[in-house]
């Protein structure tokens, strides 16, 4: 049995791509997208017509509406290939605006429903700021399910659990990147691999907290740099994996066993944790890695959204 099939015994495998032509090869249940992945996709010849057609059909509409319609078209194409859910991201520039995030999420859902997609097949991706988490809380109360992304710090995960969001995406690779950069020449790749990887340790702590305290929010590890990180998180509720790493797992027959176990998590001695807004902001501020990577991630997604808008404007001319 290859590692990808072995992983499926313990974890729901999700494809992290906007390239829906690749999906059938790996048979994921769900798929995730973000502005960077969509930008990458529309620059490929096979996807450019989809963007041009969307821009032409809705010529004269606001740029943000045309953007949402294009994201939904990608999402619908993905849903034609997979049995589960697609995650579609709200504009990262709204990450500090609760009401605007709610409004944009509701529009995305309306657009999906107009295409005949059931609300339960869509997760709205929102950055894990305090404002984003509050928006997700409100959306969940309205039956719109959310995926809280750019999650690097334990306090973000706790707040998401309190808000009863559907799913969180704690990042592994970007945490690994930060600690490796900080260590510089002192970094020992072998010693910090697998279960010792700082990104893996972060997701494990979140998973154990959720399972120990019976928090229903799904944990989906994201942002992987190598298959060792994935193997070390076998048993996590879901893992969203880029096609290149899915292919590597499918080509490997190395042993893979469960690393995260909900029953084991329930036996741990853990203290309950709760955050109000002030406590959340202080805890995040105290976490230099979490603060820096959250800000960096929002900036990067915002920049790629602007690049997408520029391509759409070119297509409209």
Curated annotation (Swiss-Prot):
Gene (UniProt): tal
Q: What does this protein do?
A: Transaldolase is important for the balance of metabolites in the pentose-phosphate pathway.
According to its UniProt record, where is this protein located? Cytoplasm
EC identifiers of the protein: 2.2.1.2
**Chemical reaction(s) catalysed:** D-sedoheptulose 7-phosphate + D-glyceraldehyde 3-phosphate = D-erythrose 4-phosphate + beta-D-fructose 6-phosphate
Pathway involvement? Carbohydrate degradation; pentose phosphate pathway; D-glyceraldehyde 3-phosphate and beta-D-fructose 6-phosphate from D-ribose 5-phosphate and D-xylulose 5-phosphate (non-oxidative stage): step 2/3
**What Gene Ontology cellular component terms go with this record?**
cytoplasm
> Which organism is this entry from?
Delftia acidovorans (strain DSM 14801 / SPH-1)
Which coarse location class applies to the principal site listed for this UniProt protein?
cytoplasm
In its UniProt record, a GO molecular function of this protein is: transaldolase activity
| Major enzyme class | transferase
| Similarity comment: family membership | Belongs to the transaldolase family. Type 1 subfamily.
Quaternary structure (record): Homodimer.
Example GO biological process term?
pentose-phosphate shunt, non-oxidative branch
The protein's name: Transaldolase
Could you name the active-site residues? 125 (schiff-base intermediate with substrate)
């Amino acid at each position: 049995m290859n590692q990808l099939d072995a992983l499926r015994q313990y974890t729901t495998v999700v494809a992290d791509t906007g390239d829906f032509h690749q999906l059938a090869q790996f048979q994921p249940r769900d798929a995730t997208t973000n502005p960077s992945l969509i930008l990458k996709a529309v620059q490929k010849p096979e996807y450019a017509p989809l963007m041009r057609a969307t821009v032409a059909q809705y010529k004269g509409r606001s740029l943000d509406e045309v953007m949402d319609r294009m994201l939904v078209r990608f999402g619908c194409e993905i849903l034609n290939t997979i049995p589960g859910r697609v995650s579609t991201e709200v504009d990262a520039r709204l990450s500090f605006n609760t009401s605007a995030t709610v409004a944009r999420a509701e529009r995305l859902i309306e657009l999906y429903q107009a295409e005949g997609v059931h609300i339960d097949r869509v997760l709205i991706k929102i950055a894990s700021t305090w404002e984003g988490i509050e928006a997700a809380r409100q959306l969940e109360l309205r039956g719109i399910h959310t995926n809280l992304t750019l999650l690097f710090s334990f306090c973000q995960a706790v707040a998401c659990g309190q808000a009863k969001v559907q799913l969180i995406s704690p990042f592994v690779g970007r945490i690994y990147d930060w600690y490796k950069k900080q260590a510089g020449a002192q970094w020992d790749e072998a010693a910090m691999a697998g279960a010792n990887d700082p990104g893996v340790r972060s997701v494990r702590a979140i998973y154990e907290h959720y399972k120990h305290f019976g928090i229903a929010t799904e944990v989906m590890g994201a942002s992987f740099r190598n298959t060792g990180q994935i193997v070390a998180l076998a048993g996590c509720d879901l893992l969203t994996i880029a096609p290149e790493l899915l292919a590597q797992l499918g080509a490997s027959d190395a042993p893979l066993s469960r690393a995260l176990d909900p029953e084991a998590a329930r036996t741990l001695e853990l203290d309950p944790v709760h955050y109000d807004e002030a406590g959340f902001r202080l805890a995040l501020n105290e976490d230099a890695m979490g603060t820096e990577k959250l800000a960096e991630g929002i900036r990067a997604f915002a920049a790629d959204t602007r690049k997408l808008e520029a391509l759409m404007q070119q297509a409209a001319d």
